[in-house]
Amino acid sequence: MNEWNKAQAGYLYDANYDREVVENRTKCADLCYEFNQCKPSDTKKQAEIIKKIIGCIKGDFVITAPFYCDYGSNITIGNNFYTNHNCTILDGAKVTFGDNVFIAPNVVFSTAGHAIDAGQRAKGLEIALPITVGDNVWIGANVSVLPGVSIGSNSTQFKSR
């Protein structure tokens, strides 16, 4: 089983030194950079680039720069998806968004977890657990969604003050 398949299966995998994993992450970083350098008025070019990044797009979407993700191929967005500035998605595992999802600025979705054992951590081993966001969800500013979390439909998530 290669490192990418280990990640998708929820096993510890080499996220830092495996050539294929690093190349895929670098390719996505280049596309995110290209997207983030677009003029805000060039929505056509932005949409073209996002369609190269995101694994599955099921309908209308707005993604406001800057936007960052690790691979993009593990991300599915439903219809009527909106994310404000500075959304970060660490998608070592699947990140699935339902329909009518609205995301405020500075939100992080992180499927990435690190090995508990210091020796494994020093080898660059990580684990990735999927994140699911249901339909009709609003996620407020500065929220961090951690590995393995599911957010139910018709809900709101916000950072307490």
Sequence positions of predicted segments:
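Terminal amphipathic alpha-helical/low-complexity segments used for targeting or macromolecular assembly
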Residues: M1-G59
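Flexible, glycine/small-residue-enriched loop-and-beta-strand segment within the central core
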Residues: F67-I77, Y82-I151
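Short, compositionally biased segments
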Residues: S155-R161
